[in-house]
Regions:
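Peripheral, non-catalytic segments of secretory and membrane proteins
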Residues: 1-156
């Protein structure tokens, strides 16, 4: 789910839940507080397709994508899901400076492709600090994921 973002703000990931009900939560939107903090955010360099519903027999085509940062100093946190198979074109998505993230433990997936008939296996995990999600291809769970820090202070 891609929620609306207020003008001047950007998202660091989209929202996912394990059912088809109306979205019941929100995501974290970010905005530079001043000129110095602009360097903490960066638009993605590219998008990598993580999953498509090809082979599932679903009535609507869908895909999940994860951005890649332009620089190793930045981390792109959340994945996005969208209709169709074309690469996203999101001007309001940003990656964050590495000093703003931390490793978090992995809980159970909020969604997986198990039973969908999809040719690609993927698990979707919730990032609790940013309230976004991260899609991981394959059947195995990662040991940890990266999310925004609970304490957002940073010096560099």
């Amino acid at each position: 789910y891609l929620p609306g973002i207020p003008d001047g703000y950007a998202m660091i990931g989209a929202y996912a839940q394990g059912n088809y009900d109306k979205p019941s939560d929100c995501i974290l939107a970010v905005k530079p507080a001043n000129e110095q903090s602009i360097s903490l955010l960066q638009i993605p360099g590219n998008w990598n397709r993580v999953w498509t519903d090809k082979g599932s027999g679903a009535s609507m085509d869908g895909s999940i994508w994860h951005p890649t940062p332009q620089s190793n100093n930045y981390v792109c946190l959340g994945s996005i899901a969208k209709k169709g198979y074309k690469q996203p074109n999101l001007s309001n998505y940003v990656c964050v400076h590495r000093c703003l993230v931390e490793s978090i433990p992995v809980n159970y997936p909020v969604w997986s492709t198990k039973g969908t008939g999809s040719k690609q296996k993927t698990n979707v995990y919730k990032l609790h600090n940013s309230n976004s999600f991260f899609a991981v291809p394959g059947k195995n769970s990662p040991a940890s994921l990266t999310d925004i820090k609970g304490n957002m202070s940073c010096s560099f």
